[in-house]
């Protein structure tokens, strides 16, 4: 019987690649996506397309309305998404307060209910936006919490957080996505709320630069 892995699936390139790595490892993969009031709702359609293309065993989307209290340019429509690069040491306005902490908690809940051995995350701390909840020390601390706070953890067989991309460059992620036949054209990385990638937000810029470096400029937004 194959192992089960829960994949947090945003619809973006990173989470799709992480899910594909779990599938390559022979795991039964269950996708979990979140409608949290993000302005870029297009990513939810992308998540569904990716789940189907990768042949995930199940795919769930749940509502977690983080826009109710805002605090991020990804949820507050009156707050513009920045179109300049990330400054060193500055956490950008696209950081959503507590987002990964909430999402991982829900992923662990699903994992324990399904008897999943792993929860795979597409977080990346290298070529990304400096978010505090995408770093190895954060994940290590969360693993300790999960082991203490769950029945399975107390019994010695708790769900393990798996972040295979956390220290990869964006170019390496693109190269792995190509190797794994991830449907890159179906993924969505843009922070803006339009029907087409803006090409100027931080997420678009990082993605496009990596695609060009990996020899696939045809998949870039512009």
UniProtKB/Swiss-Prot annotation:
Catalytic function, reaction form: 7-carboxy-7-deazaguanine + NH4(+) + ATP = 7-cyano-7-deazaguanine + ADP + phosphate + H2O + H(+)
Give the binding site residues for Zn(2+).
190, 198, 201, 204
**Names of the cofactor(s):** Zn(2+)
The entry lists its GO molecular-function terms as:
ATP binding; ligase activity, forming carbon-nitrogen bonds; zinc ion binding
- UniProt-listed GO biological process terms: queuosine biosynthetic process
Q: What is its EC number?
A: 6.3.4.20
Where, by residue number, does ATP bind?
Answer: 9-19
Keywords, comma-separated and alphabetical: ATP-binding, Ligase, Metal-binding, Nucleotide-binding, Queuosine biosynthesis, Zinc
SUPFAM superfamilies according to UniProt: Adenine nucleotide alpha hydrolases-like (SSF52402)
Protein purpose: Catalyzes the ATP-dependent conversion of 7-carboxy-7-deazaguanine (CDG) to 7-cyano-7-deazaguanine (preQ(0)).
HAMAP family, alphabetized: QueC
Q: This chain belongs to which protein, by name?
A: 7-cyano-7-deazaguanine synthase
Species in which this protein is naturally found: Synechococcus sp. (strain RCC307)
